[in-house]
Amino acid sequence: MMEEEVRDAIISELKRQAETNPSKLKLAEDGERMTVNGEVDLAALAMAIVGTIAGGP
């Protein structure tokens, strides 16, 4: 379903950002919930979501 694809894209992008800059972004997952603490690059997050909707890689 599209919702799952978008959800996965969001999680993947947030994890990528946290791995790239762990001092600025921390994530904690708990089942279907995620706690996000720190700076998020919204442009990169939006691109990941749009890419998923458009059928990108």
Describe each model-derived feature in a short phrase:
Residues M1-P57:
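Protein-protein interaction and targeting regions used for scaffolding, dimerization, and localization
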